[in-house]
């Protein structure tokens, strides 16, 4: 049973502030293509951390593909308090992360930074791969986690990059 941890840029990181942004159609097309390939490679579980942006878009696409491809979806939040201060629209998105096949919380609440380190280590040790929208030239807080992934023995990283999106956009506009 192959499991993939899903992580990537937030909507804010990408400057996408509307669910109707036309760039989302292209991003979701890339996600669908990647998820089809991952399913063919035997990935059956997708594990989320409950972040908005790339993770949420993967969740949306995976839920559409769930019946046909047999994906199982899990959300492992760092804290039970995750997202409690989000606005109503984001609370609705958070609820979708809670309506998956498996939901757990690592800790009741944040107490010290060691919890985040241990949480990340737990995620790495309990997944066999990751699906990551991240480009080293556009660093964010994911840089540290990405380094940990690269150092994890026998850990496969499937990355979606800006170059891939640009290539898809060129082909998309030609058709």
From Swiss-Prot:
Pfam families the record matches: YpsA
Superkingdom of this protein's organism: Bacteria
Cross-referenced InterPro entries: YspA
Family: Belongs to the UPF0398 family.
NCBIfam families to which the protein is assigned, alphabetical: PRK13660.1 (NF010181)
HAMAP family membership: UPF0398
Name the record gives this protein: UPF0398 protein SP_0371
Originating organism: Streptococcus pneumoniae serotype 4 (strain ATCC BAA-334 / TIGR4)
């Amino acid at each position: 049973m192959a499991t993939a941890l899903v992580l990537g840029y937030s909507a804010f990181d990408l400057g996408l502030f509307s669910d109707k942004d036309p760039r989302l159609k292209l991003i979701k097309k890339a996600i669908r293509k990647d998820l089809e390939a991952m399913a063919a490679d035997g990935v059956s579980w997708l594990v989320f951390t409950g972040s908005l942006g790339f993770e949420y878009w993967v969740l949306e696409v995976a839920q559409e593909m769930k019946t046909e491809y047999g994906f199982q979806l899990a959300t492992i939040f760092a804290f039970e308090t995750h997202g409690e201060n989000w606005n109503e629209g984001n609370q609705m998105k958070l609820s979708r992360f809670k309506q998956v096949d498996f939901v757990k919380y690592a800790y009741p609440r944040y107490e010290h930074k060691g919890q985040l380190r241990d949480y990340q280590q737990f995620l790495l040790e309990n997944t066999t791969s990751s699906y990551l929208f991240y480009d080293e030239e556009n660093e964010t807080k994911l840089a540290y986690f990405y380094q940990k992934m690269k150092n994890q023995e026998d850990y496969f990283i499937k990355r979606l990059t800006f170059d891939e999106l640009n290539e898809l956009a060129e082909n998309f506009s030609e058709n």
